[in-house]
Amino acid sequence: AAFLCDLSVAPSQAATIVRAFGMEMSASILHAVLAQRADAIIACVDTVPQRDGSCEARLTILECPPVATLREIAQACWDHFEPSLRREPGLWLWAYKHFRHKPHNTTVEYPFYANEWDAFDKLRAESGIA
């Protein structure tokens, strides 16, 4: 079985906090739950458009220690993708608002659309960040 993971979800849903581009965001834990409970493999797929109009898909199996927490697994997924996003930002769906929520009283600059939300701070505390 396979599914496409939505990396950004509301902090009130099945989420944890991950760091991305120097900011915190709430991210799905569903792929991490499947990896832990069903011993599922997490395959990260990068796609790169080719000059002939085709698309090259590069699959990497994410290696996670058996003792990794859901947050650590979710962070490892993001850590896999962030370097390629930094190298080729034009290939990412920037219109999608990944940083909808931000911590109260943060000094980090977030996109204009990010809002403070109590549920985000609660998730940060539950994740051991606050």
Predicted segment positions?
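Non-catalytic C-terminal accessory region of glycerolipid acyltransferases
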Residues: A1-A130
